[in-house]
């Protein structure tokens, strides 16, 4: 893999992992359209680690506070909800962790060979995001999240295994559906992603330690990590600022247009 190829994949991952437009869908469709070879497990680890770094660094103060609150709340059974939030995030990550461990490979294999299904997921779940953004009550903030709300958002996160759904998209949709304000739904989505993205990178990293890094992949990995981390950080900052004063419908229209575009390419034989 050359460095330009690595940088482009890092750019795609950094933007689409964070924005509600589906990283897995883009990372399947774009290389397929351009005739790029499979990037392999080594590079996949690099991309996931890069986006984890982006989210972790952006929310570093929140992470420190969550750890402190979690340790305090653990020893206080009647602790305020704010002190229980870290444990809610951990518990809400369990459904997606189990689903990812058992279903990720068969789901990805199924959808990797079906651009049409990815296109349909882009459109369907994009419209779901738009409808919840328009009609959601938007009454609650992150501090008011209950365990039930957190677990429901965590269960919705399992759907992100399907390429075209989008992890951030489905968790923001769930948050809006359950009454979170738009900014708080996005913030909780990112906090909830940290255990999952870190866990995915860790498991694949352990696999690499066991089997070794492919020859010639060290520099492309570094480039992929750097680009996905920088672009991911910028994308987090952009999205959180964007949702303070704007709706999520621009992302909905993008998803619908992308889905229709994929169908058109399939129809004329430029994508198969």
From Swiss-Prot:
EC number: 3.6.1.27
Purpose: Catalyzes the dephosphorylation of undecaprenyl diphosphate (UPP). Confers resistance to bacitracin.
GO cellular component terms, semicolon-separated: plasma membrane
NCBIfam families xrefs: undec_PP_bacA
HAMAP family documented for this protein: Undec_diphosphatase (MF_01006)
PANTHER family: UNDECAPRENYL-DIPHOSPHATASE (PTHR30622:SF4)
Membrane topology: Multi-pass membrane protein
Regions crossing the membrane: 39-59, 87-107, 113-133, 145-165, 188-208, 220-240, 251-271
Protein name: Undecaprenyl-diphosphatase
Molecular function (Gene Ontology), one example: undecaprenyl-diphosphatase activity
Note: Bacitracin is thought to be involved in the inhibition of peptidoglycan synthesis by sequestering undecaprenyl diphosphate, thereby reducing the pool of lipid carrier available.
Substrates-to-products reaction catalysed: di-trans,octa-cis-undecaprenyl diphosphate + H2O = di-trans,octa-cis-undecaprenyl phosphate + phosphate + H(+)
């Amino acid at each position: 893999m050359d460095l330009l190829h690595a940088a482009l994949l890092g750019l795609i991952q950094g933007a689409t992992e964070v924005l509600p437009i589906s990283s897995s869908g883009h990372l399947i469709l774009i290389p397929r359209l351009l005739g790029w070879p499979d990037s392999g497990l080594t590079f996949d680890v690099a991309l996931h680690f890069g986006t984890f770094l982006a989210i972790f660094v952006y929310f570093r103060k929140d992470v420190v506070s969550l750890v402190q609150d979690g340790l305090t709340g653990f020893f206080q059974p009647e602790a305020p909800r704010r002190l229980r939030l870290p444990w809610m995030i951990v518990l809400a990550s369990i459904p997606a962790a189990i689903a990812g461990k058992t279903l990720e490979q068969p789901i990805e294999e199924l959808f990797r060979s079906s651009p049409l299904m990815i296109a349909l997921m882009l459109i369907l779940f994009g419209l779901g995001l738009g409808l919840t953004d328009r009609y959601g009550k938007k009454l609650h903030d992150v501090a008011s999240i209950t365990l039930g709300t957190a677990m429901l958002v965590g269960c919705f996160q399992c759907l992100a295994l399907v390429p075209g759904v989008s992890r951030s998209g489905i968790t923001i949709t769930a948050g809006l559906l359950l009454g979170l304000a738009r900014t708080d739904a996005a913030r909780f989505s990112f906090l909830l992603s940290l255990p999952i993205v870190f866990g995915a990178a860790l498991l694949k990293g352990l696999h690499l330690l066991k089997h070794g890094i492919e020859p010639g992949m060290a520099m492309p990995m570094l480039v992929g990590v750097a680009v996905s981390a920088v672009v991911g950080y910028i994308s987090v900052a952009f999205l959180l600022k964007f949702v303070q004063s704007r709706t999520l419908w621009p992302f909905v229209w993008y998803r619908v247009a992308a889905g229709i575009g994929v169908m058109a390419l399939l129809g004329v034989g430029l994508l198969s």
